[in-house]
Amino acid sequence: VSSYYDQVGLPTDLESLNKISSEFINKYRKLYKVCNIHSGANACFEKLRSVGIYQSVLSASMESDLLSFILHFKLDHYFENISGVGDFFASGKSNISHDHLKKLNTDKSKVLLIGDTLHDAEIAQNLEIDCLLFSGGHNSVEILTESDFPIVGTFDEICNYVLD
């Protein structure tokens, strides 16, 4: 999180980081229920599930928040495994990624990490797994092109990529 704040010109000293992060998370917790999930997300999750593709979530969100979000949007039945971090500074996503991969109990060649940040691409590289980047999330397509992984812009494209 601090490296992202630095990139966008926000202060990164510990006090400012704590304040900005706390304010963001508190607002997000209050307002996420008025958000909508991306168009095509439910259809994509259902299509992948219907053909037997195992789906899981690895997130920089606090695990308790992540579970609340997933339950609110009634997505829990799509995911076999859900892993979030233990603090809201997203400092542990790389660390929990190894445990998450172990829980999948499958060959790395069968795992595809679908993410929306360069950090997700870095995690995939560190885990030595394939990655597909989604430009409709945190990082723009311009930023995501810094990675060598393929980029898609819709959930229909995600489904087509996975099913091809």
Regions found by a protein language model. Give the residues of each.
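Conserved Lys-Pro-Asp/Glu-containing loop-to-beta segment of HAD-superfamily phosphomonoesterases
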Residues: 92-122
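Acidic, Mg2+-coordinating phosphoryl-transfer loop and its flanking beta/alpha structural elements
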Residues: 112-152
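Conserved donor sugar-nucleotide recognition element shared by glycan-biosynthetic enzymes
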Residues: 1, 37, 90-93, 151
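Conserved H-loop
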Residues: 11, 76-80, 107
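Short, acidic loop-to-helix structural element flanking the phosphoryl-transfer center
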Residues: 26-57, 63-70
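A short, structured active-site edge motif that brings together acidic residues
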Residues: 18, 76-91
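Short beta->alpha linker loops
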Residues: 39-40, 61, 88, 116, ...
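N-terminal helical cap/lid subdomain that shapes the substrate entry/recognition surface
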Residues: 1-39
